[in-house]
């Protein structure tokens, strides 16, 4: 009987440890404030060069001309996953060459050229998206 209680306790401790590890990994994965400045908004305009429509997060890559130097910089724009965006976005919503205007929360490190998307507009097009994907 004592052995059964010890085994039950050991299983409980292992299960609890796994649960704590797994939930910590989920929170770390979705820690947008660690990567983005949540109370600021930045807007970029440029040419969309790549659209990765996938889970768990989609990405739009945009070439943006630096206003001071004139040099082009590739920006990575994080978006919701394909399943979260279903119904409002699909693989044909954006195509390379589209001129886009994107607003969102800027990355903490300006040299990373990152934004967490809050809105997207295809300039001279008919596609507009606004929302949240938490």
What are these regions (language model features)?
Residues 107-133:
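OB-fold/S1-family single-stranded nucleic acid-binding modules
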Residues 43, 70-74:
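Short, mixed charged/polar active-site loops
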Residues 54-65:
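Short aromatic-glycine-enriched beta-strand elements
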Residues 44-48:
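Conserved hydrophobic positions within beta-strands
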Residues 86-102:
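Short nucleic-acid-contacting surface segments enriched for D/E, G, S/T with interspersed K/R
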Residues 74-90:
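Beta-strand/loop nucleic-acid-binding surfaces
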Residues 3, 11-25:
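Bacterial N-terminal signal peptides
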Residues 27-42:
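Short boundary/loop segments of OB/S1/cold-shock single-stranded nucleic-acid-binding domains
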